[in-house]
């Protein structure tokens, strides 16, 4: 190294530490004056380090999500028909309204049933509802609601029904390639710029489609392009895994939700719960499942016992007992939450059923065999 070259610490030859701090505070103040308070901050000085959440209405799903739907984020819920997508969002709306919040429902499918919503606890008198004519209109309404900072949750049902104006004004059979994807991409850029400041949770419901010609891997995909997949902080895949019956009469379904993406908590968790026709998510059923896993309620054969006493034969009868004894159910819930806070592992807060993406990709690839003995 030449004799005249010296190594110095960054900034030591320019200004002292005190001068640098003064200059930094000056520029931070200038940025806040120009762009508003909170436009830049030290992460340790943030008033809300922990992301606030909205309950999903199902204790098992709250556990899988790390508390519920995150406030000020985009959430996507997708799955096949009649799997419980709308029911999930109506429960979230009911939870927001219970806390005194304001909720909006953008009904692009024009299929909202106010009687069913009311049966789930939604205050339909104060629910903001829009039935837009075009996708542009729907997303512009969402953007204005988010910008207002006066709405706590906005639900869009669904992305597949957000039809671009060019498609509506055209004739049947006209092809407009990528119009909906471009619309969603532009909308997500606008909405996410303000959603964090407003604290509004935006939930998009989406439908599944099949990719043509896929021989390896999952042929399913969601509508509206890839923008929503990137901008969403949480993506939930909900499936109907069982039909609940009493004799020959169907009274509900068993739903499984996979947390396909989560930016605010560990992803790839799985939650199961019952959805009862006309009543929505069985909160008592979720509580019983967790009580059994944590050992608060013990099952021996067909009988369930609590504190050594049999409380019901079979799951359905035990749920009825808990509904008829709300004080005991409250005590059980307190004990369950205490166990969970102590770190007790249950199915909903551990990653068990999903393979790592790399392993799935490896199994999806065709195997090439070489040599004369390959067929053997």
Curated annotation (Swiss-Prot):
GO cellular component: cytosol
Nucleotide-binding found in the keyword field: yes
CDD domains associated with the record: RecA (cd00983)
Family: Belongs to the RecA family.
SUPFAM superfamilies cross-referenced by the UniProt entry: P-loop containing nucleoside triphosphate hydrolases (SSF52540), RecA protein, C-terminal domain (SSF54752)
Region entry Disordered, spans: 357-376
Primary location recorded for the protein, binned into one broad class: cytoplasm
Gene3D superfamilies reported for this sequence: P-loop containing nucleotide triphosphate hydrolases
Gene Ontology BP, a term: DNA recombination
Organism: Synechococcus sp. (strain CC9902)
The UniProt record lists the keyword Protein transport: no
Function: Can catalyze the hydrolysis of ATP in the presence of single-stranded DNA, the ATP-dependent uptake of single-stranded DNA by duplex DNA, and the ATP-dependent hybridization of homologous single-stranded DNAs. It interacts with LexA causing its activation and leading to its autocatalytic cleavage.
A molecular function (GO) term: ATP binding
Compartmental location: Cytoplasm
Keywords, alphabetical: ATP-binding, Cytoplasm, DNA damage, DNA recombination, DNA repair, DNA-binding, Nucleotide-binding, SOS response
Transmembrane segments: none
Name of the protein in its database record: Protein RecA
PROSITE patterns: RECA_1, RECA_2, RECA_3
Taxonomic superkingdom: Bacteria
Pfam families linked to this entry: RecA (PF00154), RecA_C (PF21096)
UniProt-listed SMART domains: AAA
Positions that bind ATP: 79-86
């Amino acid at each position: 190294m030449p004799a005249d070259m010296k190594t110095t610490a960054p900034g030591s030859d320019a200004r002292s530490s005190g001068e640098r701090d003064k200059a930094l505070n000056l520029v931070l103040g200038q940025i806040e004056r120009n762009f508003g308070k909170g436009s830049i901050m030290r992460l340790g000085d943030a008033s809300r380090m922990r992301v606030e959440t909205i309950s999903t209405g199902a204790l098992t799903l709250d556990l899988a999500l790390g508390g519920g739907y995150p406030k000020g984020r985009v959430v996507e819920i997708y799955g096949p028909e009649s799997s419980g997508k709308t029911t999930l969002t109506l429960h979230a709306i009911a939870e927001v309204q219970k806390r005194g919040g304001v909720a909006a429902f953008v009904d692009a499918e024009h299929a909202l049933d106010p009687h069913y919503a009311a049966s789930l606890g939604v205050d339909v008198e104060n629910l903001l509802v829009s039935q837009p004519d075009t996708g542009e209109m729907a997303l512009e309404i969402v953007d204005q609601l988010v910008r207002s900072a006066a709405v706590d949750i906005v639900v869009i049902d669904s992305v597949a029904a957000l039809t671009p104006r060019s498609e509506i004004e055209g004739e049947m059979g006209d092809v407009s390639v990528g119009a909906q994807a471009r619309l969603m991409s532009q909308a997500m850029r606008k909405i996410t710029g303000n959603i964090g400041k407003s604290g509004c949770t935006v939930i998009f419901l989406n439908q599944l489609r099949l990719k043509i010609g896929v021989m390896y891997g999952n042929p399913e995909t969601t509508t509206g392009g890839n923008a929503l997949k990137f901008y969403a902080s949480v993506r939930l895949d909900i499936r109907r895994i069982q039909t609940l019956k009493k004799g020959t009469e169907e009274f509900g379904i068993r739903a499984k939700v996979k947390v396909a993406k989560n930016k605010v908590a560990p992803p790839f968790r799985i939650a199961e719960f019952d959805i009862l026709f006309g009543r929505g998510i069985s909160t008592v059923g979720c509580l019983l499942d967790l009580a059994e896993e944590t050992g608060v309620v013990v099952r021996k054969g067909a009988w369930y016992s609590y504190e050594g006493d049999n409380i019901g034969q079979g799951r359905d009868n035990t749920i009825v007992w808990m509904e008829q004894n709300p004080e005991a159910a409250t005590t059980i819930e307190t004990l369950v939450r205490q166990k969970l806070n102590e770190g007790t592992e249950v199915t909903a807060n551990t990653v068990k059923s999903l393979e790592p993406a790399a392993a799935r990709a490896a199994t999806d690839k065709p195997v090439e065999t070489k040599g004369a003995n390959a067929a053997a």
